[in-house]
Amino acid sequence: MNGLLLNVICAFTIANANPNIEKAQQTLDALYQNYTAPNTCLLRENYPFDQDNKATYLASEEQAKRRNEYSYLWPYSGTFSAVNALLESTENKKYKKLLENKVLPGLEEYFDTRREPFAYSSYISSQPLSDRFYDDNVWLGIDFTDSYRMTGKQAYLEKAKLIWKFILSGKDDVLGGGIYWCEQKKESKNTCSNAPGAVFALKLFQATQDDAYLKEGKELYEWT
């Protein structure tokens, strides 16, 4: 009981010291209240839920025309970043539990092991194959590396390394280097893949002290 009281007092003190943290907590609570898909760890794409909703940002027109019950990877992945930020800002263990019990189990619904290298696809992997975007996976890699830094959990670092292998598969010598935007449509090498890609590589270097990540990070930074 004393431990619970202490956590409540600490959370209250932090929130009052920084009103932005309180706003962030309220935003996250509202998101889960309004977007949660019943009986899952997944989220809806929009609110109120519209069964006729169609995504307009997928590379494949066939996928874009499909009606989907759950959110796509890109909006879902924002919860990973949000919970990480709150965990780092508050050091409140409830966010660590939220990460382990809701965010990551839901995220794994998007993990695609039918194609190599393994990576996260734009829609849940129990459905027909969907596009895999390098920029989406870069941000997930950053989040996994940050989670490792905060918790010391080795599994998070291993997942980040696995994602990095996928990112490297999207790099070639066309235009002198750089990472493509989408695995299925290698038509452009966008800043949204390469700038955070450099950040991801350098975070991996900080976590591992492996010079290969430092080299790749510098190359992506200079190319971008």
Task: Describe the role of every protein-language-model region.
Residues 128-129, 175-186, 211:
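Lumenal/extracellular "mature" regions of secretory-pathway glycan-modifying transferases
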Residues 11, 16-127, 154-177:
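Low-complexity, Ser/Thr/Pro/Gly-enriched N-terminal "stalk/linker" regions
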